[in-house]
Amino acid sequence: MKPMEHIKVVELSTYLAAPTAARVLAEWGADCIKIESPQGDPARTQGAVFNMPYSDEENLAFDVANFNKRFVTLNLKSETGLEVACKLLAGADVFVTSVRTKSLKKMGLDYETLKERFPRLVFAQVLGYGEQGPEKDSAGFDVTCYMARGGVFGTTVNRGDAPMIPTNGFGDFQVSLALAGGVASALFNRTRTGLGDKVTVSLHHAAVFALSTGIISAQYGNPYPKSRREVVNPFNNVYHTSDDKWVVICCPEYDRDFNKIMRLIGREDLVDSPELSNCAQVNARGKTWKVVDVLDEAFGRMTRREAMSLFKGADLPCESANEPLDIYEDEQCWANDILCRYPYPQGGRNFATNPVRFSSLGTPDYFSGGKQGSATEEVMAALGYTREQVDAAVAQGAVEGSKNLKRL
């Protein structure tokens, strides 16, 4: 039995963060119905932004956040469309949304209203900036709330360089897991209290939490961003190899590993160096750049493969700074089902599975829900609507059935 089997999820959200949380719940066995407006989730056409195909036959940019769902199209500005949504919620265990609170209130779909009507419902919401403060109603995406306001851009950049250009949704996918975990906890607590709960995760908060080490240490004089030539520990740094690749070494016990690493790279002359072998003294003298220079020279003589083989052979953590094309070829990913290949008509395509593993579940089966509105009639029939009522709702523009994706 899957962990979320018999749990019913209704989703009203767009783009990546909240939809992916619902996808994760669906992978765990939940029956997930996604509500879209007549305009559809904008993510359906985001493939154009990523140089990917987007069609009714192949739309991985949309599917990556929407596998294993059924899709209904409701005009929530209409009486009938809103009625259908509320009937869905009446039978649901979880409501997942990324709609801003002020908009939910206009529709009567905010937490306070739904709590009164459906006290067992778990209300799960992705927010940009949280529930309080001057930005609580502001628009935002992961690149603004998470990467920028949350400090990721300003912390992870090499000091003096422009902020990095991240993959889209970098913060969204992390938030999705946090929300799914919160939902699971709320459902467990409901077995004890009989009541649902409100679960929120903001992109802004998630980023600040992810930067916890920087947040706690900056106040003690460990400022960010840093230069790679001025790191506190040169053995926790990135180095450029002779084949124009980057590798990362992570050896937090500098004093213990200094002699071992110097011997490893052929610098026996620096073993027990009074100037460089003690991390505290190196930092006090402002000489970390000297150790970085030594390592730069050593790594500059090695290819990426040679560097990794040398350090891993000495049981010292060292990894390639991989790019997506490297990840496709990583046997470790395939051995652990980190990657999965979805069989589209034109060929299989790779995507990342969610990292939470259940020994009883294994790798989930994935299916694409297909066209927008593809389950509208089926879902309405299950709610008790007659064929005539469904047709009338379609004619009124309150609901829509299956329709082809329009290209931009």
What are these regions (language model features)?
Residues 344-392:
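Flexible, small-/acidic-enriched active-site or ligand-binding loops
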Residues 1-192, 305, 371, 377-408:
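N-terminal helix-loop segment corresponding to the beta1-alpha1 unit
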